[in-house]
């Protein structure tokens, strides 16, 4: 990873009005959690977008101890993402988020008002409640490839304290139930864990 000039794609107004313009169809897919809560995934369309972040971005991989402390009861491999102002030393870098994997699912967490994502979701908003936390979720199906196969991608965004979380799980369309339910379990576990404790996190 190293220090690189930042160019991340973002969700438009991450976590607030993420899905706009009514481009979703009426299709929904529901995951029922073991506590009875439901996550409603609404069929969507997607579009890419990118934005430059002022300053320089540097990253480093979380240690096993850090990952276990930040994400208890989950198997996580992730990098911490820092912004370094060109006018200050690297020792004054600012933590702005995390990017990595929980099990096979992608996770991107913004710990400031800077959104770090490589997907922009366009559609119509519908939120669910998981243990009192609002979750906005959707899914989309890819075009058929040369042999007629399609993939499905389920995703969701929600707040944990001051952090905004985006999670995404993908797989073959024929395995959509497993893809959906695996992501729903991860969402529930993240919400059960509560806000990230960054008080002892070292750059």
Residue locations for each model-derived region?
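Short, solvent-exposed recognition patches
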Residues: 37-160
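A short, solvent-exposed beta-edge/loop patch
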Residues: 123-203
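Intrinsically disordered, low-complexity regions
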Residues: 27-30, 36-39, 48, 54, ...
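Amphipathic alpha-helical interaction segments
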Residues: 9, 90, 163-166
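Short, aromatic- and cysteine-enriched interfacial helices/patches
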Residues: 19-24, 70-71, 196-201
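Intrinsic disorder/low-complexity segments
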Residues: 4-13, 32, 48, 68-69, ...
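Membrane-interface helical sensory segment of bacterial ECF anti-sigma factor regulators
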Residues: 1-47
């Amino acid at each position: 990873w190293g220090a690189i000039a930042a160019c991340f794609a973002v969700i438009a107004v991450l976590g607030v009005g993420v899905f706009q313009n009514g481009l979703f169809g009426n299709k929904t897919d529901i995951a029922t959690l073991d506590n009875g809560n439901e996550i409603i995934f609404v069929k969507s369309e997607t579009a890419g977008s990118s934005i430059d972040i002022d300053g320089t971005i540097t990253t480093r991989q979380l240690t096993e101890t850090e990952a276990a402390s930040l994400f208890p009861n989950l198997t996580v491999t992730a990098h911490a993402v820092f912004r370094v102002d060109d006018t200050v030393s690297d020792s004054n870098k600012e933590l702005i988020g995390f990017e990595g994997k929980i099990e096979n699912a992608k996770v991107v967490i913004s710990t400031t008002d800077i959104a770090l994502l490589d997907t922009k979701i366009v559609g119509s908003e519908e939120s669910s409640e998981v243990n009192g936390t609002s979750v906005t979720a959707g899914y989309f199906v890819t075009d058929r490839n040369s042999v007629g196969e399609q993939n499905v991608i389920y995703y969701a965004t929600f707040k944990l304290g001051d952090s905004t979380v985006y999670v995404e799980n993908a797989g073959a369309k024929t395995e959509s139930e497993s893809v959906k339910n695996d992501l729903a379990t991860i969402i529930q576990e993240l919400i059960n864990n509560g806000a990230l404790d960054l008080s002892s996190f070292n750059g």
